Each structure stands twice: as structure tokens, then as C-alpha cells.
């Protein structure tokens, strides 16, 4: 639920952008891609270098293009959303957006953003963050999700394996979202 809500809030911060880059293709991005496609937008998915499985997943959800996060898309983007907690992606996203484009930092935390040349911001590009969502965001998303319809891909882990789940998440080995379930629930299933 959180991934969909914060993803939706991040997408709304891009305004009416038609070509949207998504950096970090995990829980939020796989939901945002479905919503954006429903809205008639094009998604350009950026993953860790060499993550062909993640890129294939993005394309299977309707992304117009998928590639490594350190490469430029085939055309300039109107906006980009960064879900990966990697500050070094901000300058890369700024290079990928056109004049007047917006880069939205949509995660709850991020490493430091490195120094960048002013020319990346010049021509009215902007960077913003998402800290919270509003009640209205939630109402809009929950009304929209069944119309899309949003289909989530999840990988479940027993609660006793929470550390392993975090390791998989950090290393980019989760397709969609990781979900922790009580161990006794798995024994009954």
C-alpha cells in the first residue's frame, strides 16, 4: 500500500509530464508504471547497470524503454522520479530531462546528492522531494487503482527472514515488492 501511495504522490509531482523516467524499478515503480500507462504517459525505466531481468519486468508492464541508470534515454524526458535511495542518480536524471523538466526524489531516504554543475539545473529544470502524502492523494489513488487495474508483483518472506529480505531488496534481487508474513501464516498455507 505504501509503495502505491508514495508512488502516486511522486507521479502527481511531475504534473502533466508525458515522458517520465523512473529510476529504481521496485515496489513503487512497478505500480507507478501501470498508473502512468493508464493515464497515457510513457515510462522510461532505469535500473542498476546490467539488470536485464528488472528491465524486462519494466517492459512487460508497458514501459516504452528500459536501460541502465547511467545511460541516457532515447529521447529527452519531461520529468523523472527517483525511487532508488541513491543521490548520485539526481545529476543523471537532470541530464535526462528536457528544459523545464522536473526531477522528483520519491524515496523516504537517499544518500547525499553530489555536487553538480549549474548547467544541469539551468533552463528551469527543478528538483523536489516527496515527504508525505495527503488524504486526497490516498482517495485519488484508491479510486484509480481498480480502474487501471493495478496488479502488484510480490515476493513473500517469513518474518524470521526479514534480514534476508532486506539484503535482497538492497541488492536489487526483488521483482516488484517484498512482503513479510508471520512465520505461522506460512506454515498454515
Per-range role (PLM):
Residues 5, 27, 50-53, 87-88, ...:
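Short alpha-helical
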Residues 28, 32, 54, 92-93, ...:
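Aromatic/hydrophobic pocket-lining residues that form π-stacking "cages" and hydrophobic walls in ligand
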Residues 7, 36, 58, 93, ...:
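Residue-level signal for nonpolar/aromatic packing positions in well-ordered secondary structure
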Residues 106-110, 130-133, 157:
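Short strand-turn motif at the edge of the Rossmann-like AdoMet-binding core
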Amino acid at each position: 500500500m505504501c509503495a502505491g501511495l508514495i508512488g502516486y504522490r511522486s507521479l502527481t509531482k511531475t504534473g502533466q509530464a508525458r515522458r517520465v523516467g523512473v529510476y529504481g524499478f521496485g515496489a513503487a515503480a512497478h505500480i507507478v508504471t501501470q498508473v502512468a500507462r493508464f493515464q497515457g504517459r510513457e515510462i522510461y525505466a532505469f535500473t542498476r547497470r546490467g539488470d536485464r531481468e528488472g528491465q524486462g519486468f519494466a517492459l512487460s508492464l508497458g514501459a516504452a524503454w528500459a536501460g541502465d541508470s547511467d545511460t541516457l534515454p532515447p529521447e529527452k524526458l519531461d520529468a523523472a522520479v527517483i525511487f532508488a535511495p541513491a543521490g548520485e542518480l539526481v545529476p543523471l536524471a537532470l541530464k535526462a530531462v528536457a528544459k523545464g523538466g522536473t526531477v522528483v526524489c520519491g524515496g523516504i531516504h537517499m544518500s547525499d546528492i553530489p555536487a553538480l554543475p549549474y548547467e544541469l539545473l539551468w533552463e528551469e529544470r527543478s528538483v523536489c522531494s516527496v515527504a508525505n502524502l495527503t488524504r486526497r492523494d490516498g482517495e485519488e489513488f484508491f479510486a484509480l487503482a481498480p480502474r487501471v487495474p493495478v496488479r502488484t508483483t510480490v515476493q513473500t518472506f517469513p518474518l524470521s527472514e526479514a534480514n534476508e529480505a532486506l539484503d535482497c531488496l538492497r541488492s536489487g534481487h526483488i521483482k516488484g515488492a517484498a512482503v513479510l508474513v508471520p512465520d505461522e501464516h506460512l506454515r498454515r498455507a
